[in-house]
Amino acid sequence: MAAENEASQESALGAYSPVDYMSITSFPRLPEDEPAPAAPLRGRKDEDAFLGDPDTDPDSFLKSARLQRLPSSSSEMGSQDGSPLRETRKDPFSAAAAECSCRQDGLTVIVTACLTFATGVTVALVMQIYFGDPQIFQQGAVVTDASSCTALGMEVLSKQGSSVDAAVAAALCLGIVAPHSSGLGGGGVMLVHDIRRNESHLIDFRESAPGALREEALQRSWDTKPGLLVGVPGMVKGLHEAHQLYGRLPWSQVLAFAAAVAQDGFNVTHDLAHALAEQLPPNASDRFLDTFLPLGHPPLPGSLLRRPDLAEVLDILGTSGPAAFYNGGNLTLEMVAEAQHAGGVITEEDFSNYSALTEKPVCGVYRGHLVLSPPPPHTGPALISALNILEGFNLTSLVSREQALHWVAETLKIALALASRLGDPVYDSTITESMDDMLSKVEAANFRGHISDSQAAPAPLLPVYELDGAPTAAQVLVMGPDDFIVAMVSSLNRPFGSGLLTPSGILLNSQMLDFSWPNRTANHSAPSLENSVQPGKRPLSFLLPTVVRPAEGLCGTYLALGANGAARGLSGLTQVLLNVLTLNRNLSDSLARGRLHPDLQSNLLQVDSEFTEEEIEFLEARGHHVEKVDVLSWVHGSRRTNTFIIGVKDPRSPDAAGATIL
């Protein structure tokens, strides 16, 4: 009995012991959906207002923790076995009682000392949380299409730049290192998500049609007058807008990072070497050839190429901002003159009227996650529609991969047909209605009901309009220590855009090819009225930077994804999301697995080189006409599970790189 009483006394006191008290004042560990090392988020001075919120204030949490552990009444204390309280049986004024009273005073001193010690430890812990140095290095990841640009993004993060600072520098770097895919003379779209505030913004800097552009001119001369294909570039305005909203380092410093790459030179990537050897613009000027083929022949991968002309442009933009690009200065005049000399109609007024748009992304819930993607004129709604349709199928590890591929192929036929009906909503109000239908779970169920489990549809379920998006695009994905997620995709449309190079070294885009007009393609696809040519309008786009977050709360999986390949990129993103969110595969495996794409114009189901003969035979037995190609698209990704972050490139890309801060 004495041993039991002693144990009971230890148990009762243990509730107030210093070690246990320290444990209850620690912040709760977030649940993880995959193994990951703990890495608490670092507090920032500019987040003080956010930390003052009752749901996130450490002081409030500590107070609530104490209140939960303190006994609610004296009777509760008295109910503890081995309590020091006893019934008084002697005269309290007697000598014996006085001796007992002295013993009780001693116990009070011990308990008081323990509580005082615990309080001191708690205060020290709180001071360490607020004022101490971080005990664990912050994590982050950067993924781009070129290893040198990934390294540049990491350098910006290491110098206390924000996630957007890193993305801007990396995107400008890609305009130097991958000029066939992106550049100052192009445009794009950036999606930014703030994890702590659970806020998302999309910055749309898609090119717009010149005010004097007419459909008739494109019909007659688009293939002989490359200047007609040039839209008003949005790259500089868009990146500057993103920096104004989320930048931490000075604008000039961010641009100086990229200018150094142009000035010092870079190693020619495999993809650029291939583009210069196989995809040289037919109208390449002497200036173009002198810039990219300085030795008179395509450079080999790894050879050094310098762009001092672009370094000078970036220095000007760093000092003067976007005004030097858009407000009638030398850069503006050069771009206008170059396009007009090649038959274009773009003017200085078109440049001065251009603005980047800041808006909300479209979103849909899929398997407990919120999927965020760009709204029209981008095809984010079609991506979410594909996920909504697939959500109703029994896609588990128990279902054969071949059966799942059949469902995916039939679903993508519907999603791509829906995408062909989108365009710029500013010029057509019906596009908003179409978008709402694409985001509807009810509509998705209706479409799902038309998909056979055993047979490919002999004809498209919906009318299909012309689909011919930009085949090349550059990707930047950043998850920084500041708890921001950035996904960005930019493009010039065709390799090297229009092929027109200004004296300052700016390649001009060919984005007007993304509009639809009669007899635009060799197969004479029906033109889309929603995507017809109009002055100031932005064409249909398959640039789809995509962010995924938990549908409820802040704990769980976050993703940043991007893709190139136009419509094939939408197909690739759908399948990667399916692999990660439905089949619970890790990101590396999800990106590496074989992907398919239904080409609606040719009625061929294209599959990449990762497909086995057995899978192809299964699809053909279901009525699909299969065509095997080497690569359909590159899909890069970054994943965060609570505080564990990883950046992963598509293994199909020979030059891309993902880097992670450990």
Curated annotation (Swiss-Prot):
It comes from the Eukaryota. The chain crosses the membrane at residues 107-127. One of its GO terms (cellular component) is membrane. The modification Phosphoserine is found at residues 17, 72, 79, 83. Cleaved by autocatalysis into a large and a small subunit and the autocatalytic cleavage is essential to the functional activation of the enzyme. It is found in: Membrane. It is a single-pass type II membrane protein. GO terms for molecular function: glutathione hydrolase activity; leukotriene C4 gamma-glutamyl transferase activity. Pathway: Sulfur metabolism; glutathione metabolism. This is Glutathione hydrolase 7. It comes from Mus musculus. The lineage of its organism: Eukaryota, Metazoa, Chordata, Craniata, Vertebrata. The gene is Ggt7.
